[in-house]
Amino acid sequence: MLEELYRRGHRNLHLLLFGNQEKNVEFPFPSTNAGFITDMNKLAGLYSAADIFLNPTLQDVLSNVALESMACKTPSVTFRTGGVPEVVLDGRTGLVAPQGDLDQMAGHCERLIRDGKLLLALAEEGRQHAEQTFSYPVIAARHAALYEETLREYRREG
């Protein structure tokens, strides 16, 4: 996918990598590997420093990394797999390609590279979606409501 972006003429990209990386992987662009990050403030700074979060996951129940990037106003480009479509709303909070479609993923990246207005719109709506749907207070309130409903049902049934 990165080779495809390079082939399409995008030469001024810089990759910011974090997490566990395979050794001796060569990229067509300069890269910085920040390694495995445990400090949440540093991680938020890295997400915020990026323009696009590229998440080529093939399996994901709920994409926490996409949520983290969206919370930092960095839209995701990812595959449609597992719970990802609940997190990344295609065309609203990020761009989603069919699973394994590297050509479309490259096209999505290219679109965001060329369209700064779209990039900013996705970043803003992504932040709002992360806060309004997946923040700790929202999730806690949903769980509390579920427990209360379960208790009401239990009491009714006796």
Predicted regions and their residues:
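Aromatic "clamp/platform" in nucleotide-sugar-dependent glycosyltransferases that forms part
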Residues: L58
